Curated annotation (Swiss-Prot):
SUPFAM superfamilies: P-loop containing nucleoside triphosphate hydrolases (SSF52540)
Region entry Interaction with RAD51C, spans: 77-328
Self-association and partners: Part of the BCDX2 complex consisting of RAD51B, RAD51C, RAD51D and XRCC2; the complex has a ring-like structure arranged into a flat disc around a central channel. In the absence of DNA, the BCDX2 subcomplex XRCC2:RAD51D formed a multimeric ring structure; in the presence of single-stranded DNA it formed a filamentous structure with the ssDNA. Interacts with SWSAP1 and ZSWIM7; involved in homologous recombination repair. Interacts with BLM; required for stimulation of BLM activity by the BCDX2 subcomplex XRCC2:RAD51D.
Reported function: Involved in the homologous recombination repair (HRR) pathway of double-stranded DNA breaks arising during DNA replication or induced by DNA-damaging agents. Bind to single-stranded DNA (ssDNA) and has DNA-dependent ATPase activity. Part of the RAD51 paralog protein complex BCDX2 which acts in the BRCA1-BRCA2-dependent HR pathway. Upon DNA damage, BCDX2 acts downstream of BRCA2 recruitment and upstream of RAD51 recruitment. BCDX2 binds predominantly to the intersection of the four duplex arms of the Holliday junction and to junction of replication forks.
The protein's name: DNA repair protein RAD51 homolog 4
Key word DNA damage present: yes
UniProt GO BP: chromosome organization; DNA damage response; DNA strand invasion; double-strand break repair via homologous recombination; interstrand cross-link repair; nucleotide-excision repair; regulation of cell cycle; telomere maintenance
Region Interaction with XRCC2, residue ranges: 4-77
Tissue note: Highly expressed in brain followed by testis. Also expressed in heart, liver, kidney, spleen, lung and skeletal muscle.
C-alpha cells in the first residue's frame, strides 16, 4: 500500500502524517495494522478521527476488479519506454526499459554490468532529461566514468553539469539501509507526482547480490524474508509509481558445478520481469577484450534466447551493434 502523505485523503494533514511517522507508521498498511487506541494516546490524536481516517484509506486502497480493456487503457497511459543509450540492447529489450517493470542484468565479475548501468544513467539523465537514482552497494560506481559517458554525448559543460544533477547517487552497503532508503523514496516520488515536480524515473541498484547474499545460507533464517521484502519494495516502486527499476545480479555455479546460473535462488527469479545475461564473447581474443554477448533469458514480450553484441569499452562513444555469429532470431 501507499505511503502516508498530506492530502492522500480528506483529514490527513501534514501534522498528522508527521505524528504518525514519529510512531513508525509510514504506510497505509502500517496504519491498518496499528492499535488505534494506543496511537491516539501516544500521538495526541482523536481516536474517532483515526478510525474514520483508516476507514477512508482502506476503501481507497482496497482491491476492486477491473476488466481487461480498462487495464489495457491504463497500461497505455502509464507506461513509458526509456532508451538505454545502447542500440543493440534496446533492440533486445524491445525498444528499451519499460516503466512499471524490474529489469535484471546478470553477469560474472568483470562482465560489464556496472558499465551498462552507468550508460543507462547517463542516457536517461542527458538524452531523456529524466531523474535517476543510482544505488551503489558494491563501490563500483565512479563519477569519472559517468562524466566520460556524458562528455561523449555533449561537449557543452552546462549540459553535462545539468545531467549530473539529475543523477542522485546513494551508497548503501547493507540491506537495512537500502530498505529504509527505498521506503523514503516511495514517499518522495508520490509527493513529487502530486506537486508535478521532477520525479525519479529510473532506479538502478548495483547490486542486489552484495547486500542479500551475506544474509542467505547457514543459520541466518531472516535472510530470505529480508530478500523478499527488498523485492516487494522494488516492485512497488515499479508498478505503483511508474518507475523503471534496473538491478544487477551475480552468477553462481549450479549444484553439480557444471553450469552457471543467476544468484539468489529460485525465489528471486520471479522478481524481475526481464532478465539479460552479460558474457564475454567467445573467441574475442585477449583476456581484456571489451566485447560482450548479451542474451535475453527472460522477457514478457520477446522470445528468450535472442542475442546481441556490445562493446563495453566504447559505450557512449559510438553506437555499435555488430553482427553476432550464429545469432538467434
Amino acid at each position: 500500500m501507499g505511503m502516508l502523505r498530506a492530502g492522500l485523503c480528506p483529514g490527513l494533514t501534514e501534522e498528522t502524517v508527521q505524528l504518525l511517522r514519529g510512531r513508525k507508521i509510514k504506510t497505509v498498511a502500517d496504519l491498518a495494522a496499528a492499535d488505534l487506541e494506543e496511537v491516539a494516546q501516544k500521538c495526541g490524536l482523536s481516536y474517532k478521527a483515526l478510525v474514520a481516517l483508516r476507514r477512508v484509506l482502506l476503501a481507497q486502497f482496497s482491491a476492486f476488479p477491473l476488466n481487461g480493456a480498462d487495464l489495457y487503457e491504463e497500461l497505455k497511459t502509464s507506461t513509458a519506454i526509456l532508451s538505454t543509450g545502447i542500440g543493440s540492447l534496446d533492440k533486445l529489450l524491445d525498444a528499451g526499459l519499460y516503466t512499471g517493470e524490474v529489469t535484471e542484468i546478470v553477469g560474472g565479475p568483470g562482465s560489464g554490468k556496472t558499465q551498462v548501468c552507468l550508460c543507462v544513467a547517463a542516457n536517461v539523465a542527458h538524452s531523456l532529461q529524466q531523474n535517476v537514482l543510482y544505488v551503489d552497494s558494491n563501490g563500483g560506481m565512479t563519477a569519472s566514468r559517468l562524466l566520460q559517458l556524458l562528455q561523449a554525448r555533449t561537449q557543452d559543460e552546462e549540459k553535462q553539469a545539468s545531467a549530473l544533477q539529475r543523477i542522485q547517487v546513494v551508497r548503501s552497503f547493507d540491506i537495512f539501509r537500502m530498505l529504509d532508503m527505498l521506503q523514503d523514496l516511495r514517499g518522495t516520488i508520490a509527493q513529487q507526482e502530486a506537486t508535478s515536480s521532477g520525479a525519479v524515473k529510473v532506479v538502478i541498484v548495483d547490486s542486489v547480490t552484495a547486500v542479500v547474499a551475506p544474509l542467505l545460507g547457514g543459520q541466518q533464517r531472516e535472510g530470505l524474508a529480508l530478500m523478499m521484502q527488498l523485492a516487494r519494495e522494488l516492485k512497488i516502486l515499479a508498478r505503483d509509481l511508474g518507475v523503471a527499476v534496473v538491478v544487477t545480479n551475480h552468477l553462481t555455479r549450479d549444484w553439480d558445478g557444471r553450469r552457471f546460473k543467476p544468484a539468489l535462488g529460485r525465489s528471486w527469479s520471479f522478481v524481475p520481469s526481464t532478465r539479460i545475461l552479460l558474457d564475454v564473447t567467445e573467441g574475442a581474443g585477449t583476456l581484456g577484450s571489451s566485447q560482450r554477448t548479451v542474451c535475453l533469458t527472460k522477457s514478457p514480450r520477446q522470445p528468450t534466447g535472442l542475442q546481441e553484441m556490445i562493446d563495453i569499452g566504447t559505450l557512449g562513444t559510438e553506437e555499435q551493434s555488430p553482427e553476432l555469429p550464429g545469432k538467434q532470431t
